[in-house]
């Protein structure tokens, strides 16, 4: 198998590159800078310098490859709707066009459970749960659009599969955990409703397992949730994550309704005071971390043979041994 990976210098991408190389699989990875090129080269992948906007560069990089893993996305809380659209929708369109040009046979697209976010709890939902008619934030809206583009592209000679992991975590995290630690240290973090509700999670190694299985045996035009298995209480899990870094989660509490109102007010004030910049997506953060979000991944286990082999305890032990999180952090757009 010869593979091409977008987002290879991001947190998930780096782990995917390592997993592919460990299996003796040839890997090329799209990177946007020389620094990122050095990182992916150190992992054993061949860097391809370019962006999601350059169809010819993508086509040349994919030439001779069998499988495409599309993990690149813009996730920044302060990106504009136009920036989200350019990266997540137009970027995916360009990747699909280049894949067809290069005659890629199979594509695995990394999406997110956030495409379902509508402000209400998500309780053990499966892949049949409908997308909301009116997404309320640029990130989930454009990720949902990208999903649909990928699924519509499925056909003879080009098999496309979508995976939706929830709450990716693990050692070498340069995304969520460093941000959580910063919020704790700067006293910007509060438990919403005490954090006493359930969440699904997915260790980064388990995400990679699911992606590889989707590439090997996933039927075209399908979507798969990926999780660690049984959901956990959010407060307990975040407390354990922080303890691996020697940090105690001694923070206050805020009711959900107050958190939602504060987020709405914060976004409104930002738009009024800093109209030239996009307000941070505070409401989305409250909805994704302040409500129960639990997913049913039976479909992936049944159809792909997915097992989610890394347990919470194994992942926490590895985090503890790895030392401080966030070293060598990369930008939000991988």
Swiss-Prot record:
GO terms for cellular component: cytoplasm. It comes from Stigmatella aurantiaca. Its EC number is 1.1.1.394. This is 4-hydroxy-2-methyl-3-oxo-4-farnesyl-3,4-dihydroquinoline-1-oxide ketoreductase. Signal peptide: none annotated. Keywords: NAD, Oxidoreductase. Disulfide bonds: none annotated. Belongs to the 3-beta-HSD family. It comes from the Bacteria. PANTHER family: NAD(P)-BINDING DOMAIN-CONTAINING PROTEIN-RELATED, PROTEIN YEEZ. Disruption phenotype: Mutant accumulates aurachin D and aurachin C and does not produce aurachin B and aurachin A.
């Amino acid at each position: 198998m010869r593979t091409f990976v977008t987002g290879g210098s991001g947190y998930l991408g780096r782990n995917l590159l390592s997993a592919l190389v460990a299996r003796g699989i040839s890997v090329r990875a799209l990177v946007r800078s020389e620094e990122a090129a050095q990182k992916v080269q150190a992992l054993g992948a061949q860097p391809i310098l370019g962006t999601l906007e350059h169809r010819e560069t993508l086509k040349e990089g994919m030439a001779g490859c069998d499988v495409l893993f599309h993990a690149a996305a813009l996730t920044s809380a302060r990106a504009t709707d136009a920036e989200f659209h350019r990266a997540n929708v137009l970027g995916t369109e360009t990747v699909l066009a280049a894949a067809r040009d290069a005659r890629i046979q199979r594509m695995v697209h990394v999406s997110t459970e956030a495409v379902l976010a509508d402000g209400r709890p998500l309780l053990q939902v499966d892949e049949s749960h409908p997308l909301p008619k009116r997404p309320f934030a640029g990130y989930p809206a454009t990720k949902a659009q990208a999903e649909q583009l990928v699924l519509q592209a499925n056909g003879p000679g080009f098999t496309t599969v979508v995976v939706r992991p929830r709450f990716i975590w693990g050692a070498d995290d340069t995304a969520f955990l460093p941000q959580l630690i910063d919020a704790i240290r700067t006293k910007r973090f509060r438990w919403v409703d005490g954090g006493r509700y359930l969440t699904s999670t997915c260790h980064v190694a388990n995400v990679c397992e699911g992606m590889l299985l989707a590439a090997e045996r996933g039927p075209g035009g399908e979507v798969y949730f990926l999780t660690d298995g049984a959901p956990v209480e959010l407060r307990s899990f975040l407390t354990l994550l922080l303890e691996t870094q020697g940090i105690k989660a001694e923070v206050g509490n805020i009711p959900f309704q107050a958190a939602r109102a504060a987020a709405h007010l914060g976004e409104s004030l930002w738009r009024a005071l800093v109209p030239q910049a996009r307000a941070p997506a505070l409401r989305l953060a409250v909805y994704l971390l302040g409500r129960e979000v639990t997913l049913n991944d039976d479909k992936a286990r049944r159809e792909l043979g997915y097992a989610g082999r890394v347990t919470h305890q194994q992942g926490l032990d590895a985090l503890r041994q790895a030392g401080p999180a966030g070293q060598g952090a990369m930008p939000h757009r991988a």
